[in-house]
Amino acid sequence: MEQSSFIKINPADSVVVCLRPMKKGETIEVDGKTITLLQDTPAGHKVLINDAAEGTDILKYGYPIGHAKTGLKAGEWVNENNLKTNLAGTLEYTYNPVNEQLNIAKENRTFMGYVRKNGEVGVRNEVWVVPTVGCVNGVAEKLVELLKKETGCEGIDAIHAWHHNFGCSQLSGDHENTRKVLRDICLHPNAGAVLVLSLGCENNQPDDFMKMLGDYDHDRIKLLVTQKVEGDELEEGMKILRNLYAQAKEDKREEVPVSKLRVGLKCGGSDGFSGITANPLVGEFSDWLVAQGGTSILTEVPEMFGAETILMNRCENKELFEKTVHLINDFKEYFLSHGEPVGENPSPGNKAGGISTLEDKALGCTQKCGRAPVSGVLQYGDRLETTGLNLLSAPGNDLVAATALASAGCQLVLFTTGRGTPFGTFVPTMKISTNSNLAKNKPNWIDFNAGALVEGVEMKDLVSKFIDKIIAVASGEEARNEYNGYREISIFKNGVTL
């Protein structure tokens, strides 16, 4: 099957996307017209197919991605130099519900997970040390080093300390955000046992923090306040960890329905192929998972700007619509309160890859959540309560957003990328490449290649393989970030540091 040199994503579009580098003077046939390229245009970038006067909206995915800065001719390379965002401040929105019937068959798929005492299911069985404050990061790391040396991690998946810089010198919202994320980590089903490690004098007071955990498993979550230890806190910490480890290593995987999966949806280092390959692939999986009774979460609120009405109109009811309006406008207010324009999001890598405006990025980004209705809206630090597709308040920053997804209860994160990135958060963070060159050049980073979609592979066939891969990772196969040992957390901060 011959590979096409371009794709027109939506019949209403005024641009096509090049699937390979194209030269000035090359011609393409679009809608019965012959278009001659006026400049060399890289793969993933846009070519105008109709003349556009200054101020004319340019359409991609069937929606405006900005307007022409000057008059443009058919065949021109459309990029950040001649395309300007339409985004400004906060807006008023009207609820126009769209209830699309997906008609996806329910399958009896299962994975091998760890069923916890409270009924939640983990895809990993790990022992974690969670510092309440950054002052004890070194102690936490040393304890992990000692336990690894003593046990070799035999019988469990990993031993890890989740170090961070916070827990003290913070006020109000930042302080609560830190406490909520650390609480969520302690309660995460991927942990078979947790040692909460405190200094003792921090703002994040240990007794108050433990109360935040609610009705937790006291056998599997223990507290050590280092300032209260007379003598060597490492010795005392190891006593506790040995007991926690002994319990965790008795846990065994068992077959559970795929409806127990909670998956985070994230993208980073996006390019012009993101909205054509990897994001639609993840969207198809998200719809499939929701149809099985499972859960997916979309975040990166600033990267919804320009596509937010699509999500708002997919809300199951007016209450969720109003929550989504607040989700969007609150983040716009956050930008504006710091004197920053809401449309200045695409990074240099995004632009080099073919993304010119935030609308361009957002309309591709939101492909990750498919077409399922929005059934829940979460604030930062909230834990999942509703199955189905949820929206979560968090910024676009890769590590902050991925940490927020895992904190909400996702057992793994699906991360699409066109430029490539090695990082991972505290749950398996699977990388899905938008193009085959990335998958070929960085096999040590990439878990799955969606670039095959522009090389003749049918979506339904690739989705089937993708589902199998996700179930394999949920059942214990290491994601590349785990294999490489790239795992960390990052907590959102927007206030003063004392």
Describe each region flagged by the PLM.
Residues E2-L412, R419-P422, V427-L498:
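Metallocofactor- and cofactor-centric catalytic cores in central/energy metabolism, strongly enriched
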